[in-house]
């Protein structure tokens, strides 16, 4: 019985580690912690072959701005992301900074999902998108009162 309890505790601890350490990024850019060797040698870490264009980070920017505006993240976290987001090669220190930010971003998304009674995935899924971006049906919203006034 103790062996089973210890094994279960180990599994839960390991899964928690995986969720908090490895799955810290809710987006597709392959940020990661630098290895000890990379830190010792100050080896640059390549994120992509070319600089990351603003269009590729536009959704993430909107999400982070929303999280800051609703106090799920602090402004300084947005500033950190803003400084690092377009770099396609990071120093080990910058990589660690981005990973720390991604963890905070994931926790903020989890808290948002919890507050809205959504499944807590830590990623920008459909429920989070609807909260942040609203529902989009393809037709612009029309304020009927202002439309009637303009007709007169």
From Swiss-Prot:
InterPro entries: PGBD-like_sf. Keywords: Signal. It comes from the Viruses. Residues 1-24 form the signal peptide. This is Uncharacterized protein 162R.
